[in-house]
Design a protein with these regions (language model features):
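AAA+ P-loop NTPase nucleotide-binding core of proteostasis motors
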Residues: 1-57, 61-70, 74-201
Length: 201
């Protein structure tokens, strides 16, 4: 995991540094870390940011809600990064944002109530991850008339999302076993039980 993340972060900053050819635009790549709680995902990101000397903002996806509801809206993630950069926009635009518990904002199934912390948060995060201009307050985490606003471009911000994704292996096994055939040459149901690369299928 350390090697893969290091290479991913290296490629990201190499892309930022190699913008001498304006005709060639390389799309940004973000990262997804899967691992159980307490496996060191946050520590790994903190160490990387410290070594690279770039601002880091860590947020919990479960605390994010749609704008206008109690809780942090999606843009507050960029506000935290701007604060970590000492309100230096240029520095913040090269920082790292780590969003933990990303698996907890999956769309709720079979519910008629408004999903203020699920799909709407996903849509808001998608806009940030792809790269967009976000208006954020300077020196505060929420917008109000007394606080000046500044624009931060998320095009060069590295977003790393982390989550435990429980039962993901069961979902993948169920999908792979649907392709199984019948007869003497059919795949066994437990064929993927000991597959170390199951999560990559």
């Amino acid at each position: 995991a350390k090697k893969v993340i290091s290479v991913g972060v290296y490629n990201h900053y190499k892309r930022i540094g190699n913008q001498s050819e304006p005709d060639v635009e390389i799309e940004k790549s973000n990262m997804l870390m899967i691992g159980p709680t307490g496996s060191g995902k946050t520590y790994l990101v903190k160490t990387l940011a410290k070594l690279l000397n770039v601002p880091l903002a860590i947020t919990d996806a479960t605390s994010l809600t749609e704008a206008g509801y109690i809780g942090d809206d999606v843009e507050s993630v960029i506000s935290k990064l701007l604060q970590a950069a000492g309100n230096d926009v240029e520095k913040a635009e090269r920082g790292i944002v780590f969003i933990d518990e990303i698996d907890k904002i999956a769309k709720k199934r079979n519910t008629n109530s408004r999903d203020v912390s699920g799909e709407s948060v996903q849509q808001g995060l998608l806009k940030l991850l792809e790269g967009s201009n976000v208006e954020v307050p300077v020196g505060a985490t929420s917008k109000n008339a007394m606080v000046p606003l500044t624009t931060v471009n998320t095009q060069n911000i590295l977003f790393i999302c982390g989550g435990a994704f429980p039962d993901l292996d069961k979902i993948i096994k169920a999908r792979l076993n649907k392709q199984s055939s019948m007869g003497f040459q059919a795949d066994l149901k437990d064929k993927y039980d000991d597959d170390p690369n199951l999560l990559q299928k």
